[in-house]
């Protein structure tokens, strides 16, 4: 099920601290393959640690092949995304609530921030379908122990930026990393033109 993207010119600003719903956008100096040019949507950030999923790493595995009951609700492409290096044999699901949908108290849904919800993949898709515009399923997640993410932020590995709901379901033809940076004021917006392969320039 396709999700209508929000206007790209809507601003989502750099945030002073991490919270559920924040984006972690990798810096141009972060060259570790697992996180290079990644955008992570943060689901939890508390005294127990931090957890999020990479929203711009589609795999070649179709949702139909692993969780066929959820395939009709999955935004294009109907592929499993790589949420991060932790517990790659497990799955997490984010969805975008429909305008006006009353999701609080609905079994199988938990609000993360605004219209973005966590979907329990053990719940009934027929119950969830009328309430969401689309979902994205992630294999694994990105996790940090208490204080670990703070250290990475101090090293300036990540920029903390507020999200738009459309960031979660953006199709792979869109460079999410560059698009999020273009929404920022100068000079941060200029980073969006950073070459993908520096060694080629």
Curated annotation (Swiss-Prot):
Pfam families: DUF179. Gene3D superfamilies: VC0467-like. One of its GO terms (cellular component) is cytosol. Disulfide bonds: none annotated. InterPro entries: AlgH-like. SUPFAM superfamilies: VC0467-like (SSF143456). PANTHER family: UNCHARACTERIZED PROTEIN YQGE, UPF0301 PROTEIN YQGE. Belongs to the UPF0301 (AlgH) family. This is UPF0301 protein RER_60040.
């Amino acid at each position: 099920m396709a999700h209508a993207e929000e206007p790209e010119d809507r601003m989502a600003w750099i945030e002073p601290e991490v919270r559920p719903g924040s984006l972690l956008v990798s810096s141009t100096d972060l060259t570790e393959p697992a996180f290079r040019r990644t955008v992570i949507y943060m689901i939890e950030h508390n005294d127990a640690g931090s957890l999020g999923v990479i929203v711009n790493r589609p795999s070649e595995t179709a949702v139909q092949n692993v969780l066929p009951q959820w395939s009709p609700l999955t935004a294009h492409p109907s592929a499993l995304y790589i949420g991060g290096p932790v517990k790659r044999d497990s799955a997490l699901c984010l969805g975008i609530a429909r305008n006006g949908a009353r999701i609080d108290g609905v079994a199988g849904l938990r609000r993360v921030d605004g219209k973005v919800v966590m979907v329990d993949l053990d719940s009934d898709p027929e119950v969830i379908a009328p309430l969401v515009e689309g979902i994205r399923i992630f294999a694994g997640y990105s996790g940090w122990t208490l204080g670990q993410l703070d250290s990475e932020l101090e090293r300036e590995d990540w920029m903390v930026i507020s999200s738009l709901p459309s960031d979660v379901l953006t199709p792979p033809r869109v460079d999410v990393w560059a698009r999020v940076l273009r929404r920022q004021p100068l000079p941060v917006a200029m980073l969006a033109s950073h070459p993908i392969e520096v060694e080629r320039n």
